[in-house]
Amino acid sequence: MDRDTGASRRSGALGEVRAEQLLRDKEYDILAHNYVAPGAEIDLIAQDGAVIVFVEVKTRTKSGASGRESVTREKQRRICRGAIHYMMKHGLMGRQARFDVIEIQGTRVTHIVNAFPYQGPMV
């Protein structure tokens, strides 16, 4: 592993810790971290009241595209596939769900609620 990749992973892991703390401060229940499904990975899964929230965490150390902008349509589809997998596995089909992005750049943490709509087949 080269230094940039290692630094990026450490930065991403620290960002996920900060994002989780933000959600806990907002009284969300954390259900899963780094959930892996076939062809998908979801950084955080939380519950906000009755809503299941699938969260993509984007940590930026340099300026450039915002976290929301860097969650491409393909990435959204993968997150949605992972969300369906999680909900089926845990008997949550039919529950309300949403997709949030948490952007972290320096000391600024921005929680974008409903950052993108469901991208995939209707189940």
Question: What annotation goes with each model-predicted range?
Answer:
Residues 37-40:
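Short acidic/glycine-enriched loop/turn segments that link adjacent beta-strands
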Residues 60-81, 89:
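Mg2+/Mn2+-dependent nuclease catalytic core
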Residues 23, 42-63, 79:
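Conserved catalytic cores of phosphodiester-cleaving nucleases, focusing on short active-site segments
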Residues 86:
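Short alpha-helical functional segments enriched in proximate histidine and acidic residues
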Residues 91-123:
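Domain-level recognition of nuclease-like catalytic cores that cleave nucleotide substrates
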Residues 29, 52, 96:
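Hydrophobic "anchor" residues on beta-strands that sit immediately upstream
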Residues 1-33:
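Acidic-basic catalytic patches of nuclease active cores, encompassing PD-(D/E)XK
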